[in-house]
Swiss-Prot record:
MF-aspect GO terms: 3-dehydroquinate dehydratase activity
Pathway assigned to this chain's UniProt record: Metabolic intermediate biosynthesis; chorismate biosynthesis; chorismate from D-erythrose 4-phosphate and phosphoenolpyruvate: step 3/7
HAMAP family referenced in this protein's UniProt entry, alphabetically: AroQ
The protein's name: 3-dehydroquinate dehydratase
Source organism of this protein record: Campylobacter lari (strain RM2100 / D67 / ATCC BAA-1060)
Length: 160
């Protein structure tokens, strides 16, 4: 299995930007922790960060056929981007949305996610640990998909 982690605008500034909201952990530290968790589960993991909406859309589209699931922190674009929402819909695979801060305790414009309705789930407000939670969520989804495929194969064999 392979997972792509897509980071949106200003995530590269973690540990520097608004530490009272986002904490002191840098993006690279989050990625390192995720690499370790993925390695223990024998799952490949890749990372991508961009401050540009079109580059995020391109990366989401590139996931089709190359990864099994996506973790995305679209950051501010989660609240505004129909293009990112449409790209997530188009790839038809498990996508989990992450927000480091609890967006529901923040400004009103941050309280609605355009992408949440097309994601398998959202992890909001758990700080950097939210990425680990999202990864565990994808592992659970992968297990369910594999169990379903095994049951289908068994049913097909029984019908032959």
């Amino acid at each position: 299995m392979k997972v792509m982690v897509i980071q949106g605008p200003n995530i590269n500034m973690l540990g520097v930007r608004e530490t009272h909201i986002y904490g002191n952990m840098k993006m690279e530290d989050i990625h390192e922790q995720m690499k370790q968790a993925a390695k223990q589960a024998n799952v490949e993991i890749e990372f991508f960060q961009s401050n540009f909406e079109g580059e995020l859309v391109d990366k989401i589209q590139e996931c089709l056929g190359s990864v099994d699931g996506v973790i995305i922190n679209a950051a501010a674009y989660a609240h505004t981007s129909i293009a990112i929402r449409d790209a997530i819909t188009a790839i038809n695979m498990p996508v989990i949305e992450v927000h480091i801060s609890n967006t529901y305790r923040r400004e009103e414009f941050r309280q609605k996610s355009m992408i949440a309705p097309v994601c398998a789930g959202s992890v909001v407000g758990f700080g950097p640990f939210g990425y680990h939670m999202a990864l565990m969520g994808l592992f659970q989804i992968f297990d369910q998909i594999n169990a379903y495929k095994a049951a289908q194969a068994k049913a097909q064999q029984a019908n032959q």
